[in-house]
Each structure stands twice: as C-alpha cells, then as structure tokens.
C-alpha cells in the first residue's frame, strides 16, 4: 500500500465512529492525510431489551478501543429524539399507508448528515465530517462538488445518500469510497484495529438486527387478510400487508399447492382496499412487471437535475443493475420515467436514484407504476 502524503494539516474532521471497520479505517486514513481527527459515536435509539443494549454497548466499546489505538478523542451524542421524530415516525407512516419505505435513506438525510453535521459544527468546531460510506466526492474546477459511486461496485452506497445537498457533500469526506472492501479490512488488520474482522451490520438503520415482523407489530396493529392468486383464488392468509413487499418470495407459507406448476410464488401486488395480498408464479409474472413509474419528492444533489431526453440510468433498489430510462418532467416535483425494458418488482415508497455514469444525480420516491 502506498503511503499518503499529509496535505491537510490543521483541518479538523469529526468521523462518525460506529464501532465497525469502515469508520475505523476512515479515521486512520484521514490521520494519514494530515487532518486533525476526532470521533463521534451516535446513540440514536433507546434500547428496549437486553440484546439491543448489549449490542449498542459493544459497538461503543469497539469505537472507543479503535480511538484509543489511533490516539484520538471519542465524543458521544444522543440523537434518539431526532431519530424518532424525523425518521421513525416517517417509517411507520409509510408502512401504515401500504408503502415500503427505506429508513436508511431518511436516517442519512436527517441524522448522519444533518443532526451530526450541526453538532460537529456547533459543538466540536469541525471543518469537515467523515463517514465510512462507500461513495466518492469530486471537487470540480468550477467550485462544484459531485457525489460519485464507490470504487467497490458491490458495496457502493450512493443509493442511500441521494438526498444529500451539494453543501452537505462539500462538507463530507468519504475515505473508504476509493477502496475495495477487502482492502479496508486489510488496512484495519495491518494497523491492529480490533474491528478488522467484525461482521458488517445489517437491519434497520440504528435499530439493529431483530425480528422485523415482531418489531413492526409493536408499533402498528397487524390486519390479517387473504392471500389470493392473480386470478382471484384464495389460497391462504397473511398476517398483515405491511410485512410484505413486491417481489417477495420467502415467508409466504403457500408452498405445495395443488394444480400449480413448480415455479415459486411471488408477491405481485397489494390490494389495500380489500386488504388482500396478491401472488403469482414466476419472477417475471405480468403483474410484477412495470414499463415505468411516476417519481415525486425530487431531490438533485447539484440542484439542477438531469435534462429531459439525456441518456441516464436509474436504480429502484439497492444493488440493482442499472436500468436505462427516459425522463419527462411533469412539474418541478414529479417525473415520468419510462424504462427501455420492463422491470420486475418496482415498489412504491422506495427510492428511485438516477446516475450519469458514476455521478449520482439524485432521485425521488416511487409513487405509482406504469403497467401495460
């Protein structure tokens, strides 16, 4: 690994330390570049059982151990109230409305790059903040700053960060975005950081790993109903539409049906008026396919957005292959998007994120699908 010449002596960076390997290596790399680095550990959820408490305590312990190893300060802050008001209530409202939200995107918008940045500015006098996200920033000669996909295609997290403003991107550093994941772990191991082999976190942003059905049921009353085929035959019962999403294959409890072929069953629609879960066989069932979508709540990182008719691509979920598409603006806050080829399992409530090459342009929320 080539050494990095220090070029940023004196600039203060507050790194969001999660207790994971990505933030650990981010702090180390920034120190190598000459920044004055301090860590900040966020507590964003009030744990309500012992397992959660232990996991959160372990993350803080690991973050402290890494900061001790690197010789930097670790601050802590509690954003639980902000998380509840700005992320979790939105999450519940979307599920209640029958949509499938992405809390990680809202969490980045409201907590990691807003509440965190404000705290780093007002309390810790930071020049920049830094996170362990796999994205890159590019500073252009004209003074603009763009957000790019991470070098590691499999770990690229730009989909989750499309709501960042130009100003937020300009104040943020993403050291691991220039690296592959295996390189990050190798650096952590070489530096003797205890997080080098720590498993990547999954689950809902800050709420951690838990049984989703049980967790959601604590906050929203489930409404059981029928499962029907696309042809209208009742073949089972569901415990609540909110527990299911378009394209879902597992957990339907309808295997081994008589008079059906061997193709697996998928959720192809949710009938909110009748509280019916509609299923069909095969991952390309006609009810599962869309020719396009209407997208609203638009946000463009550079404030301008793509030009109508330009050759760009879209992702309608994380780690999806790029989808070539054509855009038409219906108004300042609504897009009509037509796919070059039909796409399966496009889900209202999820985010559509647009790219021009490696540049993440921004996106919006999928509102309605175009079928037929």
Curated annotation (Swiss-Prot):
Q: Which family does it belong to?
A: Belongs to the MnmA/TRMU family.
Name a GO CC annotation attached to this entry: cytoplasm
Q: Where is this region: Interaction with target base in tRNA?
A: 102-104
> What is catalysed by this protein?
S-sulfanyl-L-cysteinyl-[protein] + uridine(34) in tRNA + AH2 + ATP = 2-thiouridine(34) in tRNA + L-cysteinyl-[protein] + A + AMP + diphosphate + H(+)
Hey, where's the site called Interaction with tRNA on this chain?
133, 350
Q: Which residues bind ATP per the record?
A: 16-23, 42, 132
Q: State the disulfide connectivity.
A: 107-205
**Know the name of this protein?**
tRNA-specific 2-thiouridylase MnmA
Q: Which NCBIfam families match?
A: PRK00143.1, trmU
**Cross-referenced Pfam families, in alphabetical order?**
tRNA_Me_trans, tRNA_Me_trans_C, tRNA_Me_trans_M
Where in or outside the cell is it found? Answer: Cytoplasm
Keywords for this protein:
ATP-binding, Cytoplasm, Disulfide bond, Nucleotide-binding, RNA-binding, Transferase, tRNA processing, tRNA-binding
> Where do the catalytic residues lie?
107 (nucleophile), 205 (cysteine persulfide intermediate)
Q: Which GO terms describe its molecular function?
A: ATP binding; tRNA binding; tRNA-uridine 2-sulfurtransferase activity
Look up the domain of life of the source: Bacteria
């Amino acid at each position: 690994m080539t050494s990095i010449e220090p070029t940023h002596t004196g600039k203060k960076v507050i790194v969001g330390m999660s207790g994971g390997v990505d933030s650990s290596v981010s702090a180390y790399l920034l120190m190598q570049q000459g920044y004055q680095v301090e860590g900040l550990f966020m507590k964003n959820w009030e744990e309500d059982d012992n397992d959660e408490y232990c996991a959160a305590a372990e993350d803080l312990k690991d973050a402290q151990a890494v900061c001790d190893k690197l010789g930097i300060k670790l601050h802590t802050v509690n954003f639980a109230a902000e998380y509840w008001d700005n992320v979790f209530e939105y999450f519940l409202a979307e599920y209640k409305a029958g949509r499938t939200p992405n809390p990680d995107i809202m969490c980045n918008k409201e907590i990691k790059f807003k509440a965190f940045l404000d705290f780093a500015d007002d309390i810790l006098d930071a020049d920049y903040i830094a996170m362990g996200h796999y994205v890159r920033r590019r500073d252009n000669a004209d003074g603009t700053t763009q957000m790019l996909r991470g070098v590691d295609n499999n770990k690229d997290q730009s989909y989750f960060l499309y709501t960042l403003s130009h100003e937020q991107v300009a104040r943020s550093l993403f050291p691991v975005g220039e690296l592959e994941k295996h390189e990050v772990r190798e650096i952590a191991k070489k530096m003797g950081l205890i997080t080098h082999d720590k498993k990547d976190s999954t689950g809902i942003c800050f709420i951690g790993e838990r049984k989703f059905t049980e967790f959601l049921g604590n906050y929203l009353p489930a409404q059981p109903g029928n499962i029907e085929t696309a042809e209208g035959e009742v073949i089972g019962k569901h415990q609540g539409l909110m527990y299911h999403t378009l394209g879902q294959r597992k957990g339907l409890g309808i295997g081994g049906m008589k008079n059906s072929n061997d193709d697996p069953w998928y959720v192809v629609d949710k009938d909110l008026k009748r509280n019916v879960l509609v299923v069909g066989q095969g991952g390309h069932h006609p009810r599962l396919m869309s020719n396009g979508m209407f997208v609203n709540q638009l946000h463009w990182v550079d404030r301008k957005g793509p030009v109508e008719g330009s050759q760009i691509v879209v992702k309608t979920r994380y780690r999806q292959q790029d989808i070539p598409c054509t855009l038409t603006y219906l108004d300042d806050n609504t897009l009509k998007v037509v796919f070059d080829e039909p796409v399966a399992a496009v889900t209202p409530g999820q985010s559509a994120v647009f790219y021009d090459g490696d540049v993440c342009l921004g996106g919006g929320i999928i509102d309605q699908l175009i079928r037929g």
